[in-house]
A protein has these predicted regions:
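Short, flexible/disordered intra-domain loops and linkers
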Residues: 17-21, 123-131, 166-174
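Soluble or luminal CAZymes and related metallo-dependent hydrolases
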Residues: 18-22, 92-94, 131-142, 175, ...
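Metal-dependent phosphoester-hydrolase catalytic domains
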Residues: 32, 36-37, 86-88, 149, ...
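Structured beta-strand-rich core segments of catalytic domains in phosphoester-bond hydrolases
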Residues: 31, 36-39, 43-119, 218-219
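Active-site-proximal beta-strand elements of phosphoester/diester hydrolases
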Residues: 3-16, 108-129
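Active-site beta-strand/loop signature of hydrolases that rely on acidic residues for catalysis
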Residues: 6-13, 26-48, 111, 142-168, ...
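Surface-exposed cleft-lining segments at the edges of enzyme active sites
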Residues: 85-90, 116-138, 165
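Active-site environment of divalent metal-dependent phosphoester hydrolases
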Residues: 16-20, 45-49, 121-122, 162-166, ...
Length: 242
């Protein structure tokens, strides 16, 4: 649909401050895409001030090892947010979800920024009372119920899924199946190896049937010799489904 696409950028910032070479390079890379929407994980609040626009963030993560400005999930838009939800489902591990509705060139869009727990969450750190993949599966179960009740608007879900799609070594088949079930009604446009990248990622963009992909491309985490992150970035242009 001519004139109705928007760019959604996703980048892992690896807790770097914006005035460090790594953080500054990451911010510059996102700015170069001139997105309408951006979703970031493992990032710091307030570091997209140079963009203008509006930011929403998940609740602070639990644990003393996190700085006061660290967040697991952030979403940014050129336009104001409304109907913001930083809880989702109270049973989900805290601080890994934020959602809001914003206006884009395709109209109103519901954006859900997420950071699904990695397989060792609360195993090596935190409460240390969980088994591998337990928190990941628990989060997916609760998030799946939340997704089923979401709005009829165009929906974008983006963030760190902590799984490669399709499944490769690492995730047990039941874990991959759980993720697939939650997103059965969505198109995960970043599946496989995005153009511009040399490997599949664990950061993804998923869209519901109100939207269609126009293009998807990625960029490696090394930008001109500067390591901007421990993950690659990805951007998708989408339009309203015909």
């Amino acid at each position: 649909m001519s004139g109705s696409s928007y760019a959604n950028c996703l980048l892992e910032l690896e807790r770097k401050k914006s005035h460090t070479p790594t953080g500054a390079a990451a911010i510059a890379r996102i700015a170069a895409e001139d997105p309408e929407l951006a979703v970031l994980t493992e990032a710091r609040i307030g570091h997209r001030e140079s963009f203008g626009g509006y930011e929403i963030a998940s609740q602070p993560p639990a644990g003393e090892r996190f700085a006061a400005d660290e967040r697991k999930a952030l979403a940014w838009s050129q336009n104001p947010w409304r109907n913001v939800d930083a809880v989702g489902d109270e049973r989900m591990p805290i601080g890994r979800f934020v959602a809001g509705t914003t206006t884009t060139s395709v109209g109103d869009v519901r954006v859900m920024a997420i950071c699904i727990p990695w397989h060792m969450c609360d195993v090596r750190y935190g409460s240390k009372d969980r088994k591998p993949w337990e928190q990941h599966l628990r989060w997916l179960e609760c998030f799946g119920e939340l997704m089923a009740a979401e709005s009829s608007l165009p929906v974008v879900v983006a963030g760190d899924f902590n799984q490669r799609i399709p499944r490769r070594k690492g995730a047990p088949s039941d874990v991959a199946d759980a993720l697939a079930s939650v997103f059965a009604a969505f198109d995960i446009v970043t599946s496989g190896v995005p153009a511009g990248c040399a490997r599949p990622g664990i950061d993804h963009i998923a869209i519901n049937d109100r939207l269609q992909r126009a293009s998807v491309r990625g960029w490696p985490n090394d930008q001109g010799g500067t390591r901007t992150s421990d993950h690659d970035g990805v951007v998708a242009d989408v339009h309203l489904a015909r």
